[in-house]
Amino acid sequence: MPQLDTSTWLITILSMILTLLIVFQLKISKFNYPLNPTMKNINKDLYTNPWETKWTKIYLPLSLPQQS
């Protein structure tokens, strides 16, 4: 059985890693970042849900009466 030649594996793996790094750098460099990021003012009091103001009862399926 012939021996597996692994002499080119190092070059192949290193060139693949280098190519991936270059591709990722190019993708990141094309991304548009905002110039002046500002904080959004979030008011939680403006959005009230009906279940926050009143008590609701949750029925489990097994606690309901049997239907035949």
UniProtKB/Swiss-Prot annotation:
GO biological process, one term: proton motive force-driven ATP synthesis
Residues modified to N6-succinyllysine: K54
Subunit structure: Component of the ATP synthase complex composed at least of ATP5F1A/subunit alpha, ATP5F1B/subunit beta, ATP5MC1/subunit c (homooctomer), MT-ATP6/subunit a, MT-ATP8/subunit 8, ATP5ME/subunit e, ATP5MF/subunit f, ATP5MG/subunit g, ATP5MK/subunit k, ATP5MJ/subunit j, ATP5F1C/subunit gamma, ATP5F1D/subunit delta, ATP5F1E/subunit epsilon, ATP5PF/subunit F6, ATP5PB/subunit b, ATP5PD/subunit d, ATP5PO/subunit OSCP.
Annotated protein name in UniProt: ATP synthase F(0) complex subunit 8
Residue numbers of N6-acetyllysine PTMs: K54, K57
InterPro entries reported in the protein's UniProt record: ATP8_mammal, ATP8_metazoa
UniProt keyword annotation of Acetylation present: yes
Topological category with respect to the lipid bilayer: Single-pass membrane protein
The keyword Translocase appears for this protein: no
Family in the record: Belongs to the ATPase protein 8 family.
Subcellular location: Mitochondrion membrane
An annotated Gene Ontology molecular function: proton transmembrane transporter activity
GO cellular component, one term: proton-transporting ATP synthase complex
A Pfam family of this chain: ATP-synt_8
Alphabetized PANTHER family for the sequence: ATP SYNTHASE PROTEIN 8
Role description: Subunit 8, of the mitochondrial membrane ATP synthase complex (F(1)F(0) ATP synthase or Complex V) that produces ATP from ADP in the presence of a proton gradient across the membrane which is generated by electron transport complexes of the respiratory chain. ATP synthase complex consist of a soluble F(1) head domain - the catalytic core - and a membrane F(1) domain - the membrane proton channel. These two domains are linked by a central stalk rotating inside the F(1) region and a stationary peripheral stalk.
Residue ranges of the TM segments: 8-24
Keywords for this protein: Acetylation, ATP synthesis, CF(0), Hydrogen ion transport, Ion transport, Membrane, Mitochondrion, Transmembrane, Transmembrane helix, Transport
